[in-house]
Amino acid sequence: MKLTVKGLISLLLVPLFLAGCSKHEEQKAIQPAAHGQAAKKQATVVVPASVQGKWKAVKIAVTDKESNKETIYNVAIGSSFTIPATSLTINVDNFLPNFIMEGTTLTSQTNEPKNPAAQIRIREKGNEIFRGWLFSLYPTTHAFQHPRFSFTLVDFIPAS
C-alpha cells in the first residue's frame, strides 16, 4: 500500500480537525479576590430622625397558595409575629415610608409614604429563610418565593 504525501497529511489532519470541532468547554478556575480588592459592601439601613418613632406597625398580607386565602396581620415595627397554624415567624426590622437607595445606604427621603418599604426577616422552624424588603408599590420586586405562602406589604400604621 503506497501512501502519497497528500494522503498522509490528510490522515494526520482528520483527527486534529475532528478533535477541534468537538464540543470542549474549559472550566474556569475561580480566582481569589486580588490583594487589596474591596469585598462587596453590605447595605446599611438608616432611619432618619424625621421618620423614627412616627410609625408603629405595618400590615402584611399573607396568602396561602393552597387554599387561596389571604389574611392580613398587623406587625409592630421592631417585633416578631408567628403566623397561626404554621412554623413561620415574621420579624419587621424597619419601615421606610419613602424608600431610597443612595449607594449602599438604604434610607427614607421623607416621612411621606411615597415609596413604602418594610425590612423583614422570615423564619421557618427557627431557621431564617428570607431577609429582605417588601415594597408596597412594587409587591413583586425582590419578592420572597415560598412554596406555600406569599407576603405583601399592604398598609402601615402611624404612631398616635
Region spans (language model):
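Bacterial signal peptide processing site
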Residues: 21-25
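Post-signal peptide N-terminal segment of mature Sec-exported envelope proteins
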Residues: 29-52
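Mature extracytoplasmic domains of secretory-pathway proteins
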Residues: 79-121
